[in-house]
Swiss-Prot record:
<dbReference type="GO" id="GO:0048038">
    <property type="term" value="F:quinone binding"/>
</dbReference>
<feature type="transmembrane region" description="Helical">
    <location>
        <begin position="179"/>
        <end position="199"/>
    </location>
</feature>
<comment type="function">
    <text>NDH-1 shuttles electrons from NADH, via FMN and iron-sulfur (Fe-S) centers, to quinones in the respiratory chain. The immediate electron acceptor for the enzyme in this species is believed to be ubiquinone. Couples the redox reaction to proton translocation (for every two electrons transferred, four hydrogen ions are translocated across the cytoplasmic membrane), and thus conserves the redox energy in a proton gradient. This subunit may bind ubiquinone.</text>
</comment>
<comment type="subunit">
    <text>NDH-1 is composed of 14 different subunits. Subunits NuoA, H, J, K, L, M, N constitute the membrane sector of the complex.</text>
</comment>
<dbReference type="InterPro" id="IPR001694">
    <property type="entry name" value="NADH_UbQ_OxRdtase_su1/FPO"/>
</dbReference>
<comment type="similarity">
    <text>Belongs to the complex I subunit 1 family.</text>
</comment>
<dbReference type="Pfam" id="PF00146">
    <property type="entry name" value="NADHdh"/>
</dbReference>
<feature type="transmembrane region" description="Helical">
    <location>
        <begin position="107"/>
        <end position="127"/>
    </location>
</feature>
<feature type="transmembrane region" description="Helical">
    <location>
        <begin position="77"/>
        <end position="97"/>
    </location>
</feature>
<keyword id="KW-1278">Translocase</keyword>
<feature type="transmembrane region" description="Helical">
    <location>
        <begin position="238"/>
        <end position="258"/>
    </location>
</feature>
<feature type="transmembrane region" description="Helical">
    <location>
        <begin position="262"/>
        <end position="282"/>
    </location>
</feature>
<dbReference type="InterPro" id="IPR018086">
    <property type="entry name" value="NADH_UbQ_OxRdtase_su1_CS"/>
</dbReference>
<feature type="transmembrane region" description="Helical">
    <location>
        <begin position="147"/>
        <end position="167"/>
    </location>
</feature>
<keyword id="KW-0812">Transmembrane</keyword>
<keyword id="KW-0997">Cell inner membrane</keyword>
<dbReference type="GO" id="GO:0005886">
    <property type="term" value="C:plasma membrane"/>
</dbReference>
Length: 319
């Protein structure tokens, strides 16, 4: 009983920390975008606008939130929760230090990939429930995009699994004590980065909610806290993909002098900022180009990477 209470307390604390980190990340992103676009960005609420996300949260909480006419109310309300909850659950298996994980399971990587994949259901549910043609188009795009990119997202990580010999996040990190896997798996890292951006629906792969041609895609009819939960899920997904990249390719918590969790946080912050930089600099492709790249280029490359890694692993074990 006491153990359950402790676990529940730690879980609630972790969720609160993640919510604060997601809010802070929105401010960091807006400041960086302002810098790239030669403008100030948020600078009114708090030092350098650092509390702007708090003001935005209050604004969202006080806005009216009701389904549009003709909407499926149950699915309309359920979709935003599906957008944020699986991502929060995914952080439960992320180890930020030696023994610093809410749940250490042998198949942590598979669990995390499954949680990332569930976010596509939120887009489809929200699109269908909204009774809006633009929302429906955005939901169809989200489903097709996730189907295409989830395949080579998993395949791009199988090289790491083959080298480490485990799906456990902690064991994968420990296997990088000699050399980080980004050195051994540069192609896998590049493919994972592309797939991770697509899985999080981030620019330049935000086609399911493309403002230029779909108004706001599957979130067109959402307002208030329902919109906020979709927004929260997107930014948490970026942080989760960044943490996963650090764990699988950049040595996780390994590093000299500083404590492991500090190293993990610094590395994750660098990767997250890199995602913002990609958003600020790269144009959005056409939707057919996005899917063609996934099936005709990325998938064959991920299979090639898997085959070459298998040959090397077998050759090393034989010698």
């Amino acid at each position: 009983m006491i153990g359950m209470i402790i676990t529940a307390t730690i879980s609630v604390a972790l969720i609160m920390v993640l919510l604060v980190l997601a809010g802070t990340f929105t401010w960091v992103e807006r400041r960086l975008l302002g810098f790239v676009q030669e403008r100030y960005g948020p600078n009114r609420v708090g030092p350098f606008g650092s509390l702007q996300w708090v003001a935005d949260t209050v604004k969202i909480l006080t806005k009216e939130d009701r389904p549009p006419p003709g909407a499926d109310k149950l699915l309309y309300i359920l979709a935003p929760a599906v957008a944020a909850t699986p991502v929060l659950a995914g952080f439960g298996v992320v180890a930020i230090g030696d023994g610093w994980a809410l749940s250490s399971v042998d198949v942590g990587l598979l669990f995390l990939l499954g949680m990332l994949g569930l976010t596509a259901y939120a887009a489809v549910l929200g699109a269908w429930a909204s009774n809006n043609r633009f929302s429906l188009l955005g939901g169809m795009r989200a489903a097709a995009q996730m189907l295409a990119y989830e395949v080579f997202l998993g395949l791009s990580l199988m090289g790491v699994v083959m080298i480490a010999g485990s799906f456990s996040m902690a064991e994968i990190v420990e296997a990088q004590r000699g050399v980080w896997f980004v050195v051994l798996q540069p192609l896998g890292m590049a493919l994972f980065t592309i797939a991770g951006i697509a899985a999080a629906h981030r620019l330049p792969f935000d086609l399911p909610e493309s403002e230029n041609d779909l108004i706001a895609g599957f979130i067109t009819e959402y307002t208030g806290m329902s919109f906020g939960l979709f927004f929260l899920g997107e930014y948490l997904a970026v942080l989760l993909v960044s943490a996963l990249a650090v764990t699988l390719f950049f040595g996780g918590w390994l590093g000299p002098w500083l404590p492991g969790p500090v190293w993990f946080g610094l590395k994750t912050a660098v990767i997250a900022v890199a995602f913002v930089w990609i958003r600020a600099t790269l144009p959005r492709p056409r939707y057919d180009q996005l899917l063609s790249f996934a099936w005709k280029v990325a998938l064959p490359l991920s299979l090639l990477n898997l085959m070459l890694t298998g040959i090397v692993v077998v050759a090393r074990s034989a010698s």
